[in-house]
Amino acid sequence: MIRTVIKYFFSLLLLVSIAHANLNAQNLTGIWRGNFITESFDHYKFEIQIKQNGSSVSGVSYSYLSTIFYGKATLTGVFNKSGQNALIKEIRTVELKMAGNQGACIMKCIFQYEKSGNEEFLEGTFTSKYEKDGNGVKKGGNCGGGKVYLRKVTTSDFYIEPFLRNKVNPVKTPV
């Protein structure tokens, strides 16, 4: 009887240890693509390419609608493994194409990491602020917020950053 209890206890301890190791082994490095929806229900495509080093993340983001709007920004952030959440902030835009003289906005995203089968997701909220003064807007002024939905993918709609090369599949070109 005691041997059975001890075997059961050690089996349970082993399962808990394996589950805990898998949780702590989570790595966000890769390409995450989806969209963000503003408070006024405008939909934009959104892709981030990130590299995780410990709890720190860095990389680039792409916000795009069509040929009318496209922006690329550098980003930094932190991933809390125990809470399975991430805070990611765009630092500055490095490429920008916009119609008119609208001001560019940089985003701050708060994500929750979820896994369902083999699929991985980052979902959460964002706030944004104007990056520069101009056209009636002040640097740091409120650009609005909304919701963000991303799924980890193996290909990019854009140039794959050097820090991700050999870690993901290249963009597939039509034949």
Feature names for model-found ranges:
Residues 26-174:
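Central antiparallel beta-sheet cores of small beta-barrel/beta-sandwich binding domains
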Residues 1-29:
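Bacterial Sec-dependent N-terminal signal peptides
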